[in-house]
Amino acid sequence: MISYEYPLSERIRTLLRLEDLFRKVAHFGGSEAPLDHHVALLTIFEILEVASRADLKVDLVQELERQRQILLSFRNNPEISEEALAGALYEIEQASTALLSMAGKIGQYLRENEWLMGIRSRAAIPGGVCQFDLPSYHFWLNRDAAERRHDLDAWIMPMTPIRDGIEIVMRLLRSSGRPEQQRARAGTYQLTMAGRVAQMLRVRIPRSEAVVPEISANKYALNIRFMLPETVARPRVAEREITFELTFCTL
C-alpha cells in the first residue's frame, strides 16, 4: 500500500513539511559522502525558512499540553494500561520542557553564523555553490566525514525539540483516525463533509492499482481524482473502479 497524506489546515501543512525535512537531514547527514552532506546542509536551510514562518514553538507547546490533559483524563481507567499512559505523559512532558527551554527565535544561532548565511545566499542562485564561488565551503566538503557530521549535528541539534514535538503531535494525529474502505467510480470519488471535522486525510492505495490521487477538500466537500502516473504525457483520470482506504485524522 502507498500512503498519501493531505493536510486540511496550514498548521498541519507546516508540520508535515518540517517532519519531511528533519527526516531528510537525518538520512543525508548520516552518510559519509560530501554531496550527501551538502544536501543535508541545504535541507537545514529549508527547515530554517519553514520554521520561521509561523509561531511554531507556541503552537507545539499548546497542542502538547492539550494532549497531556486528555491523557490525564484516562487515569484510573481499567481499560487503559497505566504503564503505557505514564510513558506517553512522560514523553509529552519532556518534549514540552525542551521546547520551553528554547530561547529566542528558532534557528537564530544559524542566522548569526556569517559563513553559513553566505552559503545559504549562494545556494539560492542556480549553480551558485561551485568551488570557485565558495572555496571555503569546498574545503569543508573535503574534510573528513566525521568532522562534517560533527558540524551538521551542531547545526541541527538545537532544533531537535521542534523535531521531537512534531513527531509526537503527528503520531497522535495519525493514530486518531479509523480507516474506511472506499470505492471510486470511473476514477473519481466525492464526499459531502456534512459537519465532519478533520485536520488531515490519509489515502492508502494498493500498489497494484498504479494510480496517483489528486485531492482537494474544504469544510464542505472532498474530491479525489485518481490519475494514471504519467511522466511524459499529461496525466489522465483512470476511468475505472478503484478501491482505496480513507482515514480522517483529527486531534
UniProtKB/Swiss-Prot annotation:
A GO CC term attached to the entry: cytoplasm
InterPro entries: ZapD (IPR009777), ZapD_C (IPR027462), ZapD_sf (IPR036268)
Keywords: Cell cycle, Cell division, Cytoplasm, Septation
Superkingdom of origin organism: Bacteria
GO biological process terms on file: division septum assembly; FtsZ-dependent cytokinesis
Pfam family membership, one: ZapD
Subcellular location: Cytoplasm
SUPFAM superfamilies on file: YacF-like
HAMAP family membership: ZapD
Family statement: Belongs to the ZapD family.
Quaternary context: Interacts with FtsZ.
Protein function: Cell division factor that enhances FtsZ-ring assembly. Directly interacts with FtsZ and promotes bundling of FtsZ protofilaments, with a reduction in FtsZ GTPase activity.
Protein name as catalogued: Cell division protein ZapD
Gene that encodes the chain: zapD
